[in-house]
Amino acid sequence: MGEAGAAEEACRHMGTKEEFVKVRKKDLERLTTEVMQIRDFLPRILNGEVLESFQKLKIVEKNLERKEQELEQLKMDCEHFKARLETVQADNIREKKEKLALRQQLNEAKQQLLQQAEYCTEMGAAACTLLWGVSSSEEVVKAILGGDKALKFFSITGQTMESFVKSLDGDVQELDSDESQFVFALAGIVTNVAAIACGREFLVNSSRVLLDTILQLLGDLKPGQCTKLKVLMLMSLYNVSINLKGLKYISESPGFIPLLWWLLSDPDAEVCLHVLRLVQSVVLEPEVFSKSASEFRSSLPLQRILAMSKSRNPRLQTAAQELLEDLRTLEHNV
């Protein structure tokens, strides 16, 4: 027991024995100084880094908070726009339904209007054809002119003829429809009215716009196009030319002489026949011819008229020969 206790005591003293290192005093002082400096500066450095990290953390937290707010705002905006989109889509669907309903109503209205227009055209064609037939009577013409709708009738006549010619769109074929019959009947009525002295006087004094329209339409129609209407309009002008005032008005219209020569190029013999008659009206009236003699002679399509004087169409041949004879007489008198 005694030996064991002594050994244990010896071991305890050995474990607690201090160890020493030999260091030069100078090194110890330098080490001591450095330790003091570290002890002095380390808290400052650590405190600065911690503070900086803390500030950065604050900034990050603020940014995160702002981002969260922005995200929340974006969510609210998204919900708002989604609601607006749904509203717009609903409005769009409603508008489409309304437009579809309106389109159906418009189509129905167009169909009704078309039916009414067809009915009016049929009625106009029938009524004007009947009036065309009876207007060959002087008494009927006087009755027409004596009414308070005569001016309106001839104004509408000119407008209707003009619209019809514009609608042809280059078609050179004769049209066989209620619309064309309506227009032909109107032109025929004008021709018959102009065939009566009081009718010519009325047209020259009160319906010059109609005469201007006829001259314009004769220039608008191409050679071979709608010859029946051309013939009726030329007959109207010829009848008006029987009236000296009417002949003066027509012949003084701008481009009248070139129009006559252009119309003579039409392939239809009936058109050329009535052009020659109108030319003859100008030639046989000295007061009128003297004003356009220079232009007349310088542009006269003599070869075309000579060819017509040898035509197989007896009426065209006779008219051309008479015009050539009248021209020779004029040259002889000059």
Swiss-Prot record:
Residues 49-122 form a coiled coil. Its main location: cytoplasm. InterPro entries: ARM-like, ARM-type_fold, HSF2BP. It is found in: Cytoplasm; Chromosome. Testis specific. Overexpressed in some tumors. Residues 83-334 are annotated as: Interaction with BRCA2. GO terms for cellular component: chromosome; cytosol; nucleoplasm. Sumoylated by UBE2I in response to MEKK1-mediated stimuli. Changing residue 200 to T: Abolishes interaction with BRCA2. Keywords: Chromosome, Coiled coil, Cytoplasm, Disease variant, Premature ovarian failure, Ubl conjugation. GO terms for biological process: double-strand break repair involved in meiotic recombination; female meiosis I; male meiosis I; spermatogenesis; transcription by RNA polymerase II. Residues 14-51 are annotated as: Interaction with BRME1. Meiotic recombination factor component of recombination bridges involved in meiotic double-strand break repair. Modulates the localization of recombinases DMC1:RAD51 to meiotic double-strand break (DSB) sites through the interaction with BRCA2 and its recruitment during meiotic recombination. Indispensable for the DSB repair, homologous synapsis, and crossover formation that are needed for progression past metaphase I, is essential for spermatogenesis and male fertility. Required for proper recombinase recruitment in female meiosis. It is linked to Premature ovarian failure 19: A form of premature ovarian failure, an ovarian disorder defined as the cessation of ovarian function under the age of 40 years. It is characterized by oligomenorrhea or amenorrhea, in the presence of elevated levels of serum gonadotropins and low estradiol. POF19 is an autosomal recessive form characterized by irregular menstrual cycles and cessation of menstruation in the third decade of life. Associates with HSF2. The interaction seems to occur between the trimerization domain of HSF2 and the N-terminal hydrophilic region of HSF2BP. Interacts (via C-terminus) with BNC1. Interacts (via N-terminus) with BRCA2 and BRME1; the interactions are direct and allow the formation of a ternary complex. The complex BRME1:HSF2BP:BRCA2 interacts with SPATA22, MEIOB and RAD51. This is Heat shock factor 2-binding protein. It comes from Homo sapiens (Human).
